[in-house]
């Protein structure tokens, strides 16, 4: 069982490696802006908070085995981020009570190639974000929305698969959003774009839904 390994990455950044038995949160705590955290296959029972800018969480998939964040129906959230320039890729996330990946005011984010199953109310939920990409994720068994873009601007939702959820993709009170190339099946609602009254951002426009 290994903890953290630090490798040189560039003059101003580093690569941190986490293996089964180690803590992803410990790596985030030690990381500086611009660092990459590589997480190897194994099961991790934790909530990861990222409040620094330009942090990348990259899962390493080996022989079909993924890094697996498992909330055991005890933890509320898997990954919470508020830093700008955040990216997360190649994680399996299951059995949380609230959210798989939730952003609060983080801009320039990228959420790609994740497998999200049975994570409570929401799967991927950026809120108050600008300039984001949600791409090539698979989400199922979500109690509310698998992908929920809330009060955000310039977000692309592309080539995701959402099935067996209450809602597949929701865009709420957001502007300049592209929803394209996704597959939504066996959801109560497939793709929804709407305005909810009483929220801080009152408008929704330039939402393009095509070729889904």
Regions found by a protein language model. Name each.
Residues 39, 56-59, 86-89, 108-112, ...:
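All-beta strand scaffolds that present successive hydrophobic residues in beta-strands
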């Amino acid at each position: 069982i290994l903890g953290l390994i630090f490798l040189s990455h560039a003059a101003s950044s580093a690569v941190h490696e986490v293996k089964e038995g180690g803590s992803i949160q410990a790596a985030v705590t030690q990381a500086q802006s611009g660092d990459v955290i590589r997480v190897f296959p194994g099961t991790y029972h934790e909530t990861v908070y990222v409040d620094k800018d330009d942090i990348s969480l990259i899962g390493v998939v080996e022989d079909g085995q993924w890094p697996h964040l498992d909330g055991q129906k005890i933890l509320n959230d898997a990954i919470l981020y508020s830093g700008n320039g955040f990216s997360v890729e190649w994680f399996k996330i299951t059995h949380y009570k609230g959210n798989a990946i939730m952003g609060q005011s983080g801009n320039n984010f990228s959420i790609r190639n994740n497998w999200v199953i049975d994570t409570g109310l929401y799967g991927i939920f950026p809120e108050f974000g600008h300039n984001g990409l949600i791409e090539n994720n698979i989400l199922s068994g979500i109690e509310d929305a698998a992908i929920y873009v809330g009060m955000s601007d310039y977000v692309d939702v592309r080539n995701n698969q959402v099935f067996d959820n209450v809602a597949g993709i929701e865009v709420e009170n957001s502007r300049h959003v592209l929803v394209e190339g996704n597959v939504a099946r066996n959801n109560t609602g497939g793709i929804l774009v709407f305005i909810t009254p009483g929220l801080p951002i009152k408008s929704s426009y330039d939402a393009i839904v095509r070729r889904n």
